[in-house]
């Protein structure tokens, strides 16, 4: 019997049709089930099945047919994913699998609900105390008032990657742009560990640039106050606390917003994951960091994206992120309730506007979690920022409990 037949039978069994079927055994080899879409390559899907299998066997040593179970889990992921969303959905499912199993509660459903509400109220009180002051937000580069609009009238720009001056009207003409995609640390580039004067390790076909001033950004797309943009009439549907992360790509208009991902703090569920069509013509999707490969029919207009965002948040919603001023600038939003993990650390970290720890380092330090090991994933970053905040909230709750 081949692997496909075994996989089909395992799916039938899971639907309750096992009364007339012989007991199934794990296949000798792992083979992903076929789906109508093409969310990922076969080797990548197989690797992910093996990853799921490893989790299952560690958490449930006595599980029956773990390979079939892992194949089925990955199949459900692939079935509801596209090439753009497969990695995100996979990471979300892995997160669910790795969450600690809760012991059965002796409380009634009503008591459980009341206990949950009480816990959330305690956490929300602490979160409100953690909101960064307006003065500090300004010091860390947040725009808190709409700037003057100064249109871009330059005919040349400096490439953000290689430092070459180029003409804007020739930006889409193919050239060779050589650069290091990693930052400099202790005299070396972290992307290839070469010296500062070493040969660039990356190449691109076009030069790219940023709108460097708030005034230029205001001229392209104006900033808006969330208290004016988002209604507060139906607060029940709004999230009280959100982890948010944005992805940008290079266009002929600079560095534009192309994706918004929002995770609810209390449920860890993705409540928003949308793609935005930029104003300018695409120059570089910045895939290494954005995870975006192409424009599809799923991309929304700017106005549509703001409508979607307004469905889940308002001016009272606390937003959590890392270096969130970049995301707020990308969305052109002015918001008061911010918790920025690049700002809120113990004094020993000596965080300042010009010296901040990366989300990757913080996740490893406080969560013992390695993130950003492959292609960038906005959901992973949002969850990491939320979990870092939860780490401090938990410590605060423990401190309150021990002193009472």
From Swiss-Prot:
Outline the extent of the Exonuclease domain.
241-389
Q: Note the Gene3D superfamilies from the entry.
A: Ribonuclease H-like superfamily/Ribonuclease H
Quote the subcellular location field of this record.
Cytoplasm; Nucleus
Q: Name one GO cellular component term.
A: cytoplasm
Bias-annotated ranges (Basic and acidic residues): 18-28
Q: What does the sequence similarity comment in the record state about its family?
A: Belongs to the REXO1/REXO3 family.
Role of this protein: 3' to 5' exoribonuclease required for proper 3' end maturation of MRP RNA and of the U5L snRNA.
- The name of this protein is RNA exonuclease 3
Q: Which organism is it from?
A: Candida albicans (strain SC5314 / ATCC MYA-2876)
């Amino acid at each position: 019997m081949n692997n496909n037949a075994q996989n089909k039978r395992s799916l039938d069994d899971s639907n309750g049709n096992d009364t007339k079927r012989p007991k199934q055994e794990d296949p000798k080899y792992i083979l992903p089930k076929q789906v109508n879409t093409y969310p990922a390559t076969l080797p990548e899907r197989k690797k992910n099945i093996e990853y799921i299998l490893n989790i299952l066997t560690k958490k449930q040593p006595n599980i029956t047919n773990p390979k079939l179970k892992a194949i089925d889990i990955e199949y459900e992921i692939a079935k509801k994913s596209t090439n753009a969303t497969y990695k995100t959905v996979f990471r979300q499912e892995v997160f669910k699998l790795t969450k600690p199993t809760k012991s059965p509660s002796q409380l009634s459903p009503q008591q459980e609900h009341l206990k949950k509400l009480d816990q959330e109220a305690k956490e929300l009180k602490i979160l409100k105390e953690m909101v960064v002051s307006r003065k500090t937000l300004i010091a860390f580069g947040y725009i808190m008032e709409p700037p003057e609009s100064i249109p871009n009238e330059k005919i040349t720009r400096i490439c953000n990657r290689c430092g070459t001056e180029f003409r804007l009207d020739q930006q889409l003409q193919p050239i060779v742009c050589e650069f290091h995609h990693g930052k400099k640390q202790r005299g070396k580039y972290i992307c290839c560990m070469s010296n500062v004067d070493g040969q660039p390790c990356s190449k691109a076909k076009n030069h790219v640039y940023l709108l460097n001033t708030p005034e230029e950004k205001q001229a392209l797309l104006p900033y808006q106050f969330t208290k004016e943009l988002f209604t507060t009439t139906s607060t029940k549907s709004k999230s009280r606390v959100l982890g948010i992360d944005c992805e940008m790509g290079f266009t002929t208009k600079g560095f534009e917003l192309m994706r918004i991902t929002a995770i609810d703090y209390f449920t860890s569920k993705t409540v928003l994951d949308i793609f935005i069509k930029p104003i300018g013509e695409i120059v570089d999707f910045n895939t290494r960091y954005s995870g975006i490969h192409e424009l599809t029919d799923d991309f929304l207009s700017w106005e549509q994206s703001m409508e979607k965002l307004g469905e889940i948040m308002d001016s009272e919603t606390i937003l959590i992120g890392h270096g969130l001023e970049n995301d707020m600038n990308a969305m052109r939003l002015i918001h008061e309730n911010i918790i920025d993990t690049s700002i809120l650390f113990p004094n020993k970290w000596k965080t300042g506007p010009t010296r901040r720890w990366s989300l990757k380092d913080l996740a490893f330090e406080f969560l013992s979690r390695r993130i950003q090991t492959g292609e960038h994933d906005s959901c992973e970053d949002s969850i990491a920022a939320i979990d870092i905040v939860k780490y401090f909230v938990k410590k605060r709750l423990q401190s309150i409990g021990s002193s009472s």
